[in-house]
């Protein structure tokens, strides 16, 4: 996820989210401070999937809060 200097956040479909005040793929969710602790759950083994997740985070904001390049 790209911070773009803290001024823009790309929303779903590589369209910039409303407000342009965030730093993330889904700006409407990034301000949430809620978290859950789950105990007693077995770890998930994701062998070979780390690269897939990292490759999909190529959204960067250009001028006027537009995504550039659009490859998210």
UniProtKB/Swiss-Prot annotation:
Residues annotated as signal peptide: none
An example molecular function term from Gene Ontology annotations: metal ion binding
InterPro entries named in the record: Metalthion_15p
Disulphide bridges: none
Keywords of the record: Metal-binding, Metal-thiolate cluster
Entry superkingdom: Eukaryota
Role: Metallothioneins have a high content of cysteine residues that bind various heavy metals.
Family: Belongs to the metallothionein superfamily. Type 15 family.
Protein name per Swiss-Prot or TrEMBL: Metallothionein-like protein type 2
Organism field: Solanum lycopersicum
């Amino acid at each position: 996820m790209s911070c773009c200097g803290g001024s823009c956040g790309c929303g779903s479909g590589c369209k910039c989210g409303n407000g342009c005040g965030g730093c993330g793929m889904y700006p409407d969710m990034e301000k949430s401070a809620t978290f859950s602790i789950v105990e007693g759950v077995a770890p998930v083994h994701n062998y070979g999937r780390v690269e897939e997740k990292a490759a999909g985070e190529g959204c960067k904001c250009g001028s006027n809060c537009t995504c550039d390049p659009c490859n998210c």
